[in-house]
UniProtKB/Swiss-Prot annotation:
SUPFAM superfamilies membership: Putative cyclase
Source organism of this protein record: Bacillus cereus (strain ATCC 10987 / NRS 248)
Entry EC no(s): 3.5.1.9
Gene: kynB
Annotated positions binding substrate: 20
Lineage of source species: Bacteria, Bacillati, Bacillota, Bacilli, Bacillales
Protein name: Kynurenine formamidase
């Protein structure tokens, strides 16, 4: 692979992809086939915003929070560092203190805890709320994880979500990192221009720098 090639770190979206229990299942179908239209196939997509690789907006957990269209899209494009934090049940300031994060603006955490896009996990590693001020002090503006949430799956307080955005840190979830090495990359993970949404699916890609 050439170093200039982009590497996809997104979960493929298809009718078998796992969704949050109780949330809208993913569905794609050709609703207007070429045989009927005379010229084209037209598809219909039904999905939850939080299926597959996606970003969260504050409106997801705060009725007064910013929606996707209000977010700074510059945060989702630029240099990123991938680090390995596998075999940890939770990740906070203590777990990251020994990593060199100087000059890092975007950080992706490889937990290698699940990896089965067609099965929703029962338990995931989660982030401690104290990670937010720690990352903010380092100048980090985006945190990404390879699991569906930065908080425990059964948590209702979503303290990590709240503290991350309180400290100016954007959230990217469900990236796929098992096929890429630790190190520095360029990231593109742009959300759609959804005016009223609490999140957005993204096509997240990286390339070495």
């Amino acid at each position: 692979m050439k170093t200039s090639e982009w590497i996809d770190i997104s979960q493929p979206l298809n009718n078998d992809i796992a969704t949050w229990p109780g949330d809208t299942p993913f569905s794609y179908e050709v609703s207007w086939p070429k045989e009927e239209s005379g010229s084209v196939n037209v598809g219909k997509l039904t999905m939850s915003i939080h299926t597959g690789t996606h970003i969260d907006a504050p409106f997801h957990f705060d009725n007064e929070g910013k929606k996707v269209i209000d977010l700074d899209i510059q945060v989702y494009v630029g240099p990123v560092r991938i680090i390995d934090v596998s075999n940890l049940e939770s990740i906070g300031k203590k777990e990251l203190e020994n990593f060199n994060l100087e000059g890092v603006e975007r950080l992706l955490l490889r937990t290698s805890s699940h990896g089965k896009v067609n099965e929703f996990p029962d338990v995931i590693p989660h982030l401690h709320a104290d990670i937010a001020p720690f990352l903010s002090e380092k100048g980090i503006r985006l945190i990404g994880v390879d699991v569906p949430s930065v908080d425990p799956l059964d948590d209702k307080e979503l303290e990590a979500h709240h503290q991350l955005f309180k400290h100016g840190i954007h959230i990217l979830e469900n990236v796929v990192l098992d096929h890429v090495a630790d190190g520095d990359y360029e990231l593109i993970a742009l959300p759609l221009a959804l005016t009223d949404a609490d999140g957005s699916p993204v096509r997240a890609v990286i390339r070495p720098i």
